[in-house]
């Protein structure tokens, strides 16, 4: 009786082992954002396949083998136009991968003999890494020796990214080195890597501390802050001085206008020549002269000017030539 139970247990164990062997271990799949990924089924006897059901959180697609081509029914809208089945092998291809496509996928392969083989896949989606950026900071110490910190980073925060440095082989995104003027220039290369891509960049360090005062990037903000504070004080001061200058200039212009309005200008022509006022008086002869000519007698007489003419004479005293009054007889 005990021997019979042992045989039954052995048969059950063998059956369970065969069933477990048909279900492959979960496979890890790495996909690249925007590209495609292929889920390999490795079906040994395609002709025995009745149908294949793909699921990921919910139903994805249903494949029914046909005479010439498999019939594919996409049951989830987000995969429409992006799923393809490779004929005769029934491998599933997803194109134009998105970040939300990551997750667990399960394929239930149903054979004609009503046996089901299940395969499970874990899909991860990654971006291709761009060239990393290396930043350098240093602190000077005695004897022109400085401690240099090199930091390597990628453009965006990415998962599963590892960093390494050459020639030292440091496995970190930060590299600490000590450099002195006696050291030769060295080139340090940072390599960033994720499961689907890798990228690298290099920097050369050549006498960074020679005749260089102590420097640390954290204190680099201080001069910039002082410059901003200086500008905040200088700009309002310049604006105030300009406004004061403009107000004073306007006041001077107004005073000049008032003075010009009160000033009377007279125009004197230099070419004007004064005219002489002369009064002529002619004395007729009472008698006919004889044949013997008598000497001509000339009489000069002074004429008194009237009050009106005196006033005119007083106004014209400034002229270069005084007016004369002469009577010729």
Swiss-Prot record:
Tissue-level expression: Predominantly expressed in hematopoietic tissues such as lymph node, spleen, thymus, and bone marrow. Detected also in lung.
UniProtKB keywords: Adaptive immunity, Autophagy, Cell adhesion, Cell membrane, Disulfide bond, Glycoprotein, Immunity, Immunoglobulin domain, Innate immunity, Membrane, Phosphoprotein, Receptor, Repeat, Signal, Transmembrane, Transmembrane helix
Location in or out of the cell: Cell membrane
Ranges of the Extracellular topological domain: 22-221
Outcome of substituting residue 300 to F: Modulates macrophage cytokine secretion
Keyword Oxidoreductase: no
Domain Ig-like C2-type: 132-206
Pfam assignment, any one: V-set
Classification via InterPro entries: CD2/SLAM_rcpt, Ig-like_dom, Ig-like_dom_sf, Ig-like_fold, Ig_sub, Ig_V-set
Cytoplasmic compartment segments: 243-329
One of the GO BP terms on file: positive regulation of NF-kappaB transcription factor activity
Source superkingdom: Eukaryota
CDD domains with a match to the protein in the record: Ig_SLAM-like_N
Membrane topology: Single-pass type I membrane protein
PTM comment text: Phosphorylated by tyrosine-protein kinase LCK on tyrosine residues following ligation induced by agonist monoclonal antibody. The association with SH2D1A/SAP is dependent of tyrosine phosphorylation of its cytoplasmic domain. Phosphorylated on Tyr-280 and Tyr-300 following platelet aggregation. Phosphorylated on tyrosine residues upon high affinity immunoglobulin epsilon receptor aggregation in mast cells. N-glycosylated.
Disulfide pairings: 152-190
Transmembrane region(s): 222-242
An annotated GO cellular component: plasma membrane
Positions where Phosphotyrosine occurs in the chain: 265, 280, 300
Entry domain remark: The ITSMs (immunoreceptor tyrosine-based switch motifs) with the consensus sequence T-X-Y-X-X-[VI] present in SLAM family receptors have overlapping specificity for activating and inhibitory SH2 domain-containingbinding partners. Especially they mediate the interaction with the SH2 domain of SH2D1A and SH2D1B. A 'two-out-of-three-pronged' mechanism is proposed involving threonine (position -2), phosphorylated tyrosine (position 0) and valine/isoleucine (position +3).
PANTHER family linked to this entry: SIGNALING LYMPHOCYTIC ACTIVATION MOLECULE (PTHR12080), SLAM FAMILY MEMBER 5 (PTHR12080:SF103)
Assembly behavior: Homodimer; via its extracellular domain. Forms a head to tail dimer with a CD48 molecule from another cell. Interacts with SH2 domain-containing proteins SH2D1A/SAP and SH2D1B/EAT-2. Interacts with tyrosine-protein phosphatases PTPN6/SHP-1 and PTPN11/SHP-2 via its phosphorylated cytoplasmic domain, and this interaction is blocked by SH2D1A.
Name of the molecule in the record: SLAM family member 5
